[in-house]
Amino acid sequence: MAGVRQHGWRAIPAVCSEYGADTLPDRYRSDGRCLLFRQQAGISALKQELEVKTPYRAMNHPVIGVVTKADLASMEQISLVKCWLREAGAHNVLVTSAVNNNGVTELFALLHTEEGCR
């Protein structure tokens, strides 16, 4: 497709403690601390000549917060992480567990709505 650019995703892992969030070179922790991922996801096809080049372009994208592995966390931990995600700018916060298949359908439904895709 000539003149079309596709954007992928990237993930930045971080561990939250009482001192804040620290980025990690590895993806998983075995010490039980809360692991967060900030992902910028989206596949869009834009004509290159219409693409706006600005360092603040990502600021106009919607933010969806997703709490994963909910089957391993307590309700208190889940509530705390949901609060952090809302404070970070997430308009929609979903709780998911692939083991129990909880929240996965809701996540896909949100991603396929105009509100989730804007």
Curated annotation (Swiss-Prot):
GO terms for biological process: biogenic amine metabolic process. InterPro entries: EutP_PduV, P-loop_NTPase. It comes from the Bacteria. Gene3D superfamilies: P-loop containing nucleotide triphosphate hydrolases. It holds the Pfam family PduV-EutP. One of its GO terms (molecular function) is ATP binding. This is Uncharacterized protein YoeF.
